[in-house]
Amino acid sequence: MNKHDQKKKRNKQHTDNVMGKKSKGFIKNKKNIGESGNEKKRNNNFNNIWKKKKRSGNSEKDQVDILGLLKGDSENMNDDDDNNMNDDYNNNNIKGDYNNNNIKDDDVDDDDYDDDDDDNFDENKNCNDNCSSKHKRNVPSKKEHDILELNNINFNETRKKMINYKNIFDGKFCDLKYILSESLINTLEKNEFIKMTSIQKMSIPLFFKPNDIFLKSMTGSGKTLCYAIPSIEKILNMKEKVKITRDMGIFVLVLSPTRELAIQINNLFCILTKPYPYIVASCITGGEKKKSEKNRLKKGISILTCTPGRLLDHLENTKSLKLTFLKMVILDEADKIIYLGTQDKIKLIYDMIRKIKQEEFSKVHKKKKKEENEVLDHINDTNMSDMNNISNDHSNDYEQFILDKFQMIFISATLNHAMKTLANYCLTNNTMWIEKEKKNGINGGNKNDETKQKSNDMISCMNRENSPLNIHNNDDNDDNDDNDENNGDNNNNNDDNNNNNDDNNNKNNDDDNNNTYELPEQLKQYCILIDMKQKFICLIYMLLDCIEKKKKPVVFLSNHHSVEYLQILLKNIYWPTDVNKKNIEVNKKLNEKITPVLEREDEKLLRKHLEQNILNNNYYNNNYNVGNISYKNINLEEIQNEDELNDEPGNLYNINADKHKRIYLFNNVNIYILHGNLSKEDRLGNFMDFSKTNNSILLCTDIISRGIHFDSLSVVIQYDPPQILEEYIHKVGRTARLNKQGSAYLFLLKSQKQFLNILKNKNIQLKIILGNTIINHFKKFCIPNFLKSVGKDILNFLHNHMQTIVKSNNTLMEKGTSAFLCTITSFYSTSKNLRSIFNAKDIHLGHLAYTFLLEKTPKQISKYKKEQNYINIKKQTVLSKKEKRLLKSKQFQKKQKRK
């Protein structure tokens, strides 16, 4: 052998010993190996690559050990589990290094998901940071142990779920050509309704049957199109036999619990009925003049969406309401209607519509009999051909569509005992139960995941006897029998049909324990465990973070007073820019040493501002010439001391001195509010403006918690705890709709941890974020640089500043006191299930006042509220001249400030 061949053998043996069997995978071009110098370079490169490979392998094992800690297991994971995780990783083609930060649900998503989203809000990251110091001992800390007991997440399973989360779309609307007309399919495609969800695919054909239907599906699955498309198609099918006009009256009636949802449903019907001018869609929700609504009803409405109270009023008082050709009555978000306590109105509406339909059908039936008798009388005088012409009259064509029955449809995402009783009362015609079900025992993450997921999701369609609507209790059956007997008495004894509220609540609680809820898998749910004092600052950080990432957040609150208070407060909050020199000693006690906040540029701006104020005052008060005033030698310290005399001694900030250079936290951000006490115009205006604008925040009560759809809504924040368990599910369902990603955050105190266990029983798991982590992020990323010199107690510094803002504004004080008192009363209206967890007695009222930025004690706040109510009443009454002077006097205002 040549020397050259011997060198080749040695180099090959060396590379095989170092790299083993995997050396083949790293050698790209074997043919080019010829010269000895190039061979040495390549071999060195191979050695370096293999060393890096070994290091990365060791780090992966260490990271898997950390995962074992996060699971709560003292033992490390097996090698088989490691191989399975690596196989899943390779199969799913996820980009990025397989390190500890990537093993979390925030980052393991589709390629479209942004890496920056929710990096700061990951509780696994917090756990990993805490576990890094304890990794050597393999012993978690107490905080970690508490979190792990609550979390109990199998990371391997959740990771697979988030990689292969379920696609709710299944087919296209053009696949339903055998049911839907071409024109309707074209209108759907023009309006970008191309794909349909699995619940739409299975339920739309069933709506063409005459049976009553109860449709139950998760939020964001497209339930409105499930009934909107068949209702329009049924009217189009009538067109083949009869000319459709507005005089025929209402064909489809949709009942909605709120105005906003009714408007949204009506907008969808208006879009789908644009090519059909003879189909008129309209909305009646109250708040308008009845004359205008009656005029619209006289002209004729084909598809009417309305609220229950307004419809009941028109059924009782408006004669122009035509229901002769009524085909469908749809109750959307039925659980919300029951929660609002309007189930009695719906029973009345159902009975009245049923009575009207039977009367009109009997009239038509009598007409038919008269015509038949007339035909029989004239048989001898007429031929058979003439008789056929009589039977083919246009009036008979219209009469064949007049029926004594109509299709009743219930649509909801949840089910409870009160809903069952209402459904059993209204759904009487061979009721069909449609629900999306899951089979247990099918594990995701294998190669055949997609085929298994299709078999995993099933649409169950069953009769009343086999459905969850069947109530097996004898007491309930007796109640239903009593209700059926009272139906024929023209609703004279409607109060006897209602059960006691306490009995209904107990039945609801027992029934809720058996139900489990389904939510979209792409929805990320977080629970923020905080102390009461940290609550407001955590909210500010989350809102600022959403604005930076260009996300639209919705904040749910318990009452309308806190909604109005937060709106005014967020608009008026600004960073502290000027510190009183009189109170610099107070700041030194808080911190060892504080550098002056004002810089030279700020001093120049302040000097110019003060100079102009002096010029204006002298010009208006003394009428001096502006040129004669010597303002060049103005002393800033003397002027500031004069301004400080007007301020209270306890304030840290001179509020009036820094108006010219305030930096507002939510500058150029639109903050909208929605609650039931707003006027109709304001509600509609805020609703439409928020849906159109991008850089905006919505503060609201539970008025939009059900059925409302916002396209670009990505964050839901529940600042106050839910009063009912179902309320949490519906609020969370405003985001992550139609396969879009979204995140939901729930604020909970540490004493309210048991609520997470209740959600676990309902197949809902939340990741926990500690409040301290959010506050640390707030200190790092949100506080401006000129305030970082304050030191560690920056939060107390900022809180005192915000308290002075509230103190100086009378409207903020009034709104804050009313919001504080209403939040306390809201805890007393929680359901019996949650009353032990969200108990008003467990809340520290002083800390609650601290979150509302109120300096006074709870007793002082209640006294202040009584005085304000007394003053407001006195202002409305007729006052004497002395009383008016007393209210305007400075002495009276000073007394109020002291109080």
UniProtKB/Swiss-Prot annotation:
It catalyses: ATP + H2O = ADP + phosphate + H(+). It is found in: Nucleus, Nucleolus. A motif (DEAD box) lies at residues 332-335. Residues 76-85, 106-121, 476-487 have a biased composition (Acidic residues). Its EC number is 5.6.2.-. Keywords: ATP-binding, Helicase, Hydrolase, Isomerase, Methylation, Nucleotide-binding, Nucleus, RNA-binding. Its main location: nucleus. Residues 86-102, 488-503 have a biased composition (Low complexity). Belongs to the DEAD box helicase family. DDX31/DBP7 subfamily. InterPro entries: DEAD/DEAH_box_helicase_dom, DEAD_box_RNA_helicase, Helicase_ATP-bd, Helicase_C-like, P-loop_NTPase, RNA-helicase_DEAD-box_CS, SPB4-like_CTE. GO terms for molecular function: ATP binding; ATP hydrolysis activity; RNA binding; RNA helicase activity. PROSITE patterns: DEAD_ATP_HELICASE (PS00039), HELICASE_ATP_BIND_1 (PS51192), HELICASE_CTER (PS51194). The Q motif is unique to and characteristic of the DEAD box family of RNA helicases and controls ATP binding and hydrolysis. It comes from the Eukaryota. Residues 463-472 have a biased composition (Polar residues). The gene is DDX31. GO terms for cellular component: nucleolus. The lineage of its organism: Eukaryota, Sar, Alveolata, Apicomplexa, Aconoidasida. SUPFAM superfamilies: P-loop containing nucleoside triphosphate hydrolases. GO terms for biological process: maturation of LSU-rRNA from tricistronic rRNA transcript (SSU-rRNA, 5.8S rRNA, LSU-rRNA); RNA metabolic process. This is ATP-dependent DNA helicase DDX31. Residues 1-12, 21-31 have a biased composition (Basic residues). ATP binds at S217, M218, T219, G220, S221, G222, K223, T224. Residues 593-782 form the Helicase C-terminal domain. Residues 204-433 form the Helicase ATP-binding domain. Has DNA helicase activity and may also have RNA helicase activity; the DNA helicase direction was not determined. Shows ssDNA and RNA dependent ATPase activity.
